[in-house]
Structures are given as structure tokens and as C-alpha cells.
Amino acid sequence: MLKPPRAAALAVAAVLAASAGLPAQARLTTPQQQFGHEIGADYRLPNYRALVDWWQKLAAESDRMELVDIGRTAEGRTQYMAIVSSPANLRDRERYRQTAATLARARVDSAQAVRLSREGKAVVWIDGGLHANEVLGAQQLMETLWQLVSRSDPETLRILDDVIVLFVHANPDGMDLVSNWYTRTPDLQRRSLAALPRLYQKYIGHDNNRDFYASTQPETENMNRVMYTEWYPQIVYNHHQTGPSGTVMFAPPFRDPFNYAFDPLIPTGIDLVGAAMHTRFEAEDKPGVTMRRGANYSTWWNGGLRTTAYFHNMIGLLTETIGSPTPIDIPFIADRQLPRGDLPFPIEPQRWHFRRSIDYSVTANYAVLDLASRYREQFLYRIWRMGMNSIRRGSQDHWTRYPRRLDEVRDSIAARQPQAGANAVMVPGGLVQGAPGPV
């Protein structure tokens, strides 16, 4: 029989030998180890410094992740982007970046576009924290990244093989300000996000999401450069808060009318991704997600992070989700208790904890990434198709359809052909009298 010290030494050696053969993901620093609690725990809100410390550890520990400095913030912090994919994709990421750029610029013919779409990887942008008092955004970013680098289930591995995910913190300065403000008191029950002492973006505060066409702030410039001159993601997902009262989240599709100035593959692409999100929420028994006229969000505001993406032929997504590290209540709203087209799975009034908002955000992210994986080639090819459509329209005369112009056409027809009647229709040869009326 071995003496105890000798037995202990052999046991330790056996454990070390076994762990040496494990993949990097098996030895990752967990949220519990890093923060002392799970992400989304009540009354806890890690700041940007804590996020960076953890991401730097994970980047050193995992072969699924690289941490990239994309520039300075208004207050001089480093703004980081985490690139997450399979180890093989990360080793060859420059080639995949160039493929995405080539397709987005639409400077190749159809045969080349098909070939590049088969060879390339879908690129998906997920950001968080732009409006820093909407604290879920940055926290869900941390949790989703953690799940992608730590899980080894078939779906996650497939996503990592097919997709390159860009996790971008949109407002590092604001996260430090808001998190430090919330946790300034040791009395958990007194913690509050109210009465922030200053703007959470040094110069423009909440209007940092009005800056993506003017690009006046360093954070905006950093992100626009990555999106529109470096990586050209096919999908841009912008997380916000808060959800409509009596629900948990608003998710696409957006309300009508959609912006008819965009390529039709934009609204149909948004609808495709939105359907995947809602279907996954229902399948995971997560009620309370509304769409379309469940809130007033649309494709019309042109200065925001996800809406400027439409002008670059990218599928821009927005979700608005409830949640705070201080528990809240979902109120009873009678009009939101009966299932309908824009709220197929209502939620009952109840106490709500921050961790559940994290879980909903992860579900939404995984729905997007799963779809990008399954339709990788189509997303790559369609951004090329939209680019070619734009080049063609810009290279020849065309009639842009606007409501006012259509009204002018109707008035002109009525003035020139008053005898035609209300049911006349215009055809290439002229008006047709007595066209069928409504049935």
C-alpha cells in the first residue's frame, strides 16, 4: 500500500496528465470564478474593467476567441472587439474577412460570387452597451460570448464552424460610469440606476445612437470602420432596452410601412431572421416577445447603428428587452394577454429577475447565429446580390417610387382621362375601361 504523500502525488500527476490532453475550452475561467456570481445575478453589475479582465483571460485560455483593439474611446479607454469562431476559422480569418469584403463590394461576377459564398463564412455583428443605462446590453454580450467559447454541443460547434461572430462593446466609458454608479453603495437593496451624475457618453450621451451617419465620436468611428471598411457583416444585431410594458422583448419584424428605398432583400431578410427568433422563443417556452405593431420601431430612422447598416445592404436587427439587476415586475396589461399576430405567446404578470433577461438575450443571439449558420451561403450571396442591384440602379435611369409621386400620377391620370371612371387601370397601351372592381 502506498504511503499517503506518495499516493497524493500520483493522483495529482494523473489529473495533470489527463487535463493536458483536454481542449482549451475545458480550462476556462468561469463567470463564477471571475466575478463571484453568475452573469445577471440580482444586484450585481460588473463594469467594463471587469469585462476586459475576463475577456483577456478567456482569449489566452481559449482557441475559439481573439481580442482585438479597435481604437480609443472619448475618455481614452481601449474599445475591444472579441472575434469568436472555430480555431480553424480564426487561423484563416483574414481570408474570410477579405471574402466578406469582396462580396459586399460586389466587384465580382455571379460565378465568382457563388464560389466565394461557398468558400466563405457568415459574419455576424452583435453589440451591446451603446446606451449604457440599458445595462442588459453589455451583460448579455458577456454571457453569449461565454457560452460560445465554453459549450461543445452540436449546435454551438456548427455555429463556430460556419460563422465568425464579432462581439463589440459599443460604449466602454458608459459601462464603467453606470456600473460604478449602481454599485457605489454596499447596501444591495438601495442600489439604483437612477440619477446618473453625467452623460454616459462624454459629449453626446444618449444621442450616440444618432451619430452613425455623421460619425463624430471616436467610438462611432471605430465601429463604422469595422463594419463598413473591414469586416462587412451580413447581419448587424444591436441590443437595446427596454421592452414594451406587459412584455419581455420587442424583436423584428418591424412595423409597416417599411422603408421602400432599400433593396427588397433587406425587409425580407429582416423578416426571415425575425421569424427564426420568435420561433426559438416559443420552442424554448419563453413567452412575452412581441413584434411589428407591438412597438413603434421601424426601418425609417437612418442615423442609428442598425439602420445605417441597411444602406450597406446588411440585415440590421434591433431588440428592446426589459430587465435590471434590481428585480422588477411585469405588469398586468389586459390588451397583452390574448395571443395575436404581433404577440403570439403572451406572458402573465410576474416578478422578473435580471438573469431571465440574460437568458432571453442568449436565445435571441443563438437564433440569429443558428440561422446564419444554416443559410451561410445565402447570406453571403445575397449581400453581393444587393450590391449588384445597387450598382445597376445607380448606373442607369430609373423611376424611384415614392408615395407623393404615385399620388401625382393618379392625379395626372384623373385629369387627363376623367371619363375613364374609378375602375380604369393603366396598362402599357393606355387606360382600360371598366376594370373589375373589388371583390
Language-model region placement:
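Structured catalytic-domain cores with a bias toward divalent-metal coordination
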Residues: 25-439
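Bacterial N-terminal signal peptides
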Residues: 9-19
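Sec/Tat signal peptide C-region and signal peptidase I cleavage site
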Residues: 20-24
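Bacterial N-terminal signal peptides that target proteins for export
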Residues: 1-11
